[in-house]
């Protein structure tokens, strides 16, 4: 999830129709007062980056039981913990802060927040929900 949302932030011409950022361990917020990779301070970015970012069709996909602490230094450091105690909180923060920033700037916001009950930090169990977002429900076809 971390790679996907950052890739779209910094690659305005990314050949993406839809994307899924699942259970990011920490997030890059659209805030120039927070040091990168937790915010945009110290990197070249502008409101145009944010416009292209929020214009992409992207789902923030989160397991509702992804409540455990992260163990790697970058995702368990002070800056990451300031974003929330776990991936569920951090993913919701990314969605909400980015939606608010888009509204402040008058940009369309084409993201979706999808939470999945009874799933933790488990890509295998989240994959069917990502597939439905990306390709539609197979049973509908």
Range-by-range predicted roles:
Residues 17-100:
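The feature captures the conserved acid-bearing segment of alpha/beta-hydrolase catalytic domains
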Residues 10-13, 47-52, 103-105, 140-141:
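Surface-exposed acidic, glycine-flexible loop patches that form ligand/cofactor-binding
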Residues 15, 56, 107-109:
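Residue-level signal for beta-strand positions within conserved beta-sheet cores that form or flank
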Residues 95-141:
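C-terminal catalytic histidine-bearing segment of alpha/beta-hydrolase fold enzymes
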Residues 1-7, 17-19:
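A surface/extracellular/periplasmic glyco- and lipid-processing/surface-interacting theme
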Residues 1-2, 65, 117-122:
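Short, internal active-site loops enriched in acidic
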Residues 4-12, 129-131:
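Short glycine-enriched nucleophile-adjacent loop
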